[in-house]
Amino acid sequence: MPTIQQLVRDGRYTKSFKTASPALDRCPQKRGVCTRVYTTTPKKPNSALRKVARVRLSNGIEVTAYIPGEGHNLQEHSIVLIRGGRVKDLPGVRYHIVRGSLDTSGVADRRNGRSKYGAKRPKEGAKK
């Protein structure tokens, strides 16, 4: 507990909060253009070909973003919307691409968790 004299001399200081997604500039999402779409492999215990894209954001920063879901229609020069959220087994990937917005299509034939993948509600007659 500081003395009054120490508070007068030094004052209180606020702890600075370091954001997990600095390229978003405190925005919930940002728009960007894909400069490269490719696959990469995850860290040690896992094995896969994860789909990622290099995206140049509207503020000029270039980031690597993960493309969630099965299958995608992205290619170079596609306009995408990115949100924060890292991929634990891909080092350096701190952003997700939002499916179903701008040039990104939703996941086809998705039935559960559709809102996270931009999939429309299936027609009632089209059951299995």
Curated annotation (Swiss-Prot):
GO terms for biological process: translation. InterPro entries: NA-bd_OB-fold (IPR012340), Ribosomal_uS12 (IPR006032), Ribosomal_uS12_bac (IPR005679). The keyword Ribosomal protein applies. The modification 3-methylthioaspartic acid is found at D89. GO terms for cellular component: small ribosomal subunit. Residues 101-128 are annotated as: Disordered. With S4 and S5 plays an important role in translational accuracy. Interacts with and stabilizes bases of the 16S rRNA that are involved in tRNA selection in the A site and with the mRNA backbone. Located at the interface of the 30S and 50S subunits, it traverses the body of the 30S subunit contacting proteins on the other side and probably holding the rRNA structure together. The combined cluster of proteins S8, S12 and S17 appears to hold together the shoulder and platform of the 30S subunit. PANTHER family: 30S RIBOSOMAL PROTEIN S12 FAMILY MEMBER. HAMAP family: Ribosomal_uS12_B. This is Small ribosomal subunit protein uS12. It comes from Chloroherpeton thalassium (strain ATCC 35110 / GB-78). The gene is rpsL.
